[in-house]
A protein has these predicted regions:
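Flexible "arm" and connector segments at domain edges
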Residues: 1-81, 85-147
Length: 147
């Protein structure tokens, strides 16, 4: 019994070598980013208020824009884009919003507006590809105003 107890304690130590170890890797990335921030915050590694993550987002956004100056360096662009998304997940945590819910809302809003654009195009007897970007933008602005 004593040996089994020591083995269990050894396994627990291995399992808990980091506060982040309990995060499932299969979570959607945005939710995992949010939960990562929660875990780090739980041990005191966090900004005192929402100003910190907002400043971090601005810093990461600047770095992404700089990386875009070298479009051939796709690895850097991808890394900086990830940093932007991670910083937004942290900011949303600080202001009390679940980023998954916020993103779902934005997607649903886009779907409603896009369907309005499709219906408007259909009412003219044309398909979307025939309208051109200028006309599509007019229909999009109309959808934004109406919905």
């Amino acid at each position: 019994e004593e040996i089994k107890s020591k083995e269990r304690k050894g396994k627990e130590c291995k399992k808990r070598s980091s506060v982040l170890d309990g995060l499932p890797s299969h979570l959607p990335a945005l939710l995992r980013a949010y939960r990562t921030g929660e875990k780090a915050s739980g041990i005191g590694f966090d900004w005192p208020d929402a100003t910190g993550p907002l400043e971090k987002y601005n810093e990461e956004w600047t770095e992404l824009r700089e990386a875009l100056d070298s479009p051939e360096d796709r690895d850097s662009i991808k890394e900086e884009l990830g940093d932007v998304l991670f910083s937004l997940a942290n900011y949303s945590r600080h202001i009390g919003f679940d980023p998954e819910d916020a993103l779902r809302g934005a997607i649903n809003k886009f779907h409603q507006r896009f369907r309005h654009v499709e219906r408007s195009a259909l009412s003219t007897g044309k398909n979307l590809r025939e309208l051109g970007i200028d006309r599509l933008n007019v229909l999009w602005e109309d959808a934004k105003r109406l919905l």
